[in-house]
């Protein structure tokens, strides 16, 4: 009789447990992507079976073949207490609803070809994680900072919201959409981060090199699809 009661009790609580764990997906790796030479992989994961705040992780092997996992970016470290009470743009909320995305924190990312630069958004802000590699230990040393924060604060009507950011293969630029325009972010340099509006994408650069703008054309197509979804 006790066993039957346990089964009935489990059935009774199953719907709520399934909802609290996002269909039992919390705490499990997701959105994995191999990078570099294929020996490393980026992925997202929260800290527990009922933790909704997802962080960015790296799976890698050392010279002896031992496997390691390193947390690259943690929303709670970047935002503090506000990481548990998200304030995302309406357009991003709509995208998450369509994708049945119930997690918070870092729910998507874009990496360059080497896999050492990754961009993502948290609460509508744009972040960049740079990975340096320790010459002695061979371990990754991640550094995360906000990209172009001053620009976003100076003219939010022009430069926000930050939606669907994608980093260039060489890791030097980021393209995102505001829902109305494409925005190009130049990372770093002597003048710091800079944002410019992209009103058109040419198949050739100033020197007539068609390969230079290939990534922009692809991202423009992705962003166009993203824009149409909100019409």
For every predicted segment, state its role.
Residues 1-228:
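Beta-propeller folds
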